[in-house]
Amino acid sequence: MPAMTPAFRRADLTGFLRTYGAALILLLAAMLAWQPAQAQLRVDISGTGATQYPVAIADFAVDDTHGRALAEVIRADLTRTGQFRLINAADSGLNVDSQVAHDDWRAKGADFLAYGSITRGPDGRYDVRYRLADTVKKGQLDGVAFSGTEQELRRVAHQIADRIYEKITGVRGVFSTRIAYVLKRGSTYELQVADADGQNPQVALRSREPIISPSWSPDGSRLAYVSFESGKPVVYVHTLATSARIPVANFKGNNSAPAWSPDGSQLAVALTRDGLSQIYIVSAGGGSNMRRITRSPGIDTEPNFTPDGRSIIFTSDRSGGPQIYQTGLDGGDARRLTFNGGYNISPRISPDGSTLLYVARRDGAFRIASLNLSSGSETLLTDGRDDQSPSFAPNGMQVLYAAIQNGRSVLAGVSSDRRVRQTLSVLNGEIREPTWGPFTR
């Protein structure tokens, strides 16, 4: 079964669609309960950024156990970016009201110092107060208070790491965002949602057949995906908080490759209802509203809206081999975007609209590439043999994708400048089809 592989991996594209539609049927009953997953992702990191900011993260005072754990999450978040060099802050004795000895910390090599306090209130909730000092300018860069239950402290740590990252780099942090992916364990497939660091995985959907093409809504509350339980591929929209879902594309033939409009009201999808796969727009709330966008003699698939919502990027073989095109929502003439190589698929556009991300076949290997849309310059970001499903972080600084490592499917990440790489894997199972969720605050 050619599940989980791009639609353009075979030379006979029309034959692939016939095979794909016939093979991926009869989905067994899916369990839609929102429940904790049984395994955490393991993260391995290599490389460093071109610039590394020296920062000390002190254990948060008062509640030693929770304060140490809070600081460890913040340190781990910053370390994963490769952009920070951690300065030892063991036994600092700092609390949120401490006077910072800027010169002393500067002498230790720290340009920045994060510190704070955590206390448990009478209602059982924890109050977390944090400060960020600039030891060079000898001033306070940031200071804020949070409140949460014990179960919410990890989220609070991610939010603090986001603030540290943004105050120092000027770019919004993504540590409190989420990722979605498909985990295959034995004969079972699970659509899972986890924190950006791979922790706290939750099962959104479980089935005995493949789940494909998960796509986040702009507000992070819903996932669109393709399911086959009715005997044919159908696009569903799934509300994560309630596990409620509705079919939004249930037409004759294949319904596939959902992608959200920036306002969350519509989905671009690939349908074969009128013959070869073409691009359509349907309502994200269900109903009968549908509009055809492309009308080509080839196969058009893998649509994605541009950030301004005015056009769609998609894959098409109209020129022979699969390439990436852009067309307006009026369905006018499409403009070809990729010209390097004879095989480029799975387009994703950066949050600022400046960079195109895609899978490129180069020297027989499938690698993740980026294209500067202004200059036309292409960069190969990965060096694997079978890298797939690229997805930008919502700040555009990192890329998540599926890779093969030691014969198993894993999630991998690479910084947009190629300098920092990470791998997310599980002890039992294979993970694939990643998609990085949006900012939600």
From Swiss-Prot:
Keyword Ribonucleoprotein in record: no
Cellular component terms per the entry's GO annotation: periplasmic space
GO biological process: cell division; protein import
Keyword set, alphabetical order: Cell cycle, Cell division, Periplasm, Signal
InterPro entries given in the database record: 6-blade_b-propeller_TolB-like, PD40, Tol-Pal_TolB, TolB_N
Database matches in Pfam families: PD40 (PF07676), TolB_N (PF04052)
Extent of the signal sequence: 1-39
Location in the cell: Periplasm
Superkingdom in the source lineage: Bacteria
The keyword Cell cycle appears for this protein: yes
Assembly information from the UniProt record: The Tol-Pal system is composed of five core proteins: the inner membrane proteins TolA, TolQ and TolR, the periplasmic protein TolB and the outer membrane protein Pal. They form a network linking the inner and outer membranes and the peptidoglycan layer.
Family: Belongs to the TolB family.
Function summary: Part of the Tol-Pal system, which plays a role in outer membrane invagination during cell division and is important for maintaining outer membrane integrity.
Name of the protein: Tol-Pal system protein TolB
The organism of origin for this protein: Bordetella parapertussis (strain 12822 / ATCC BAA-587 / NCTC 13253)
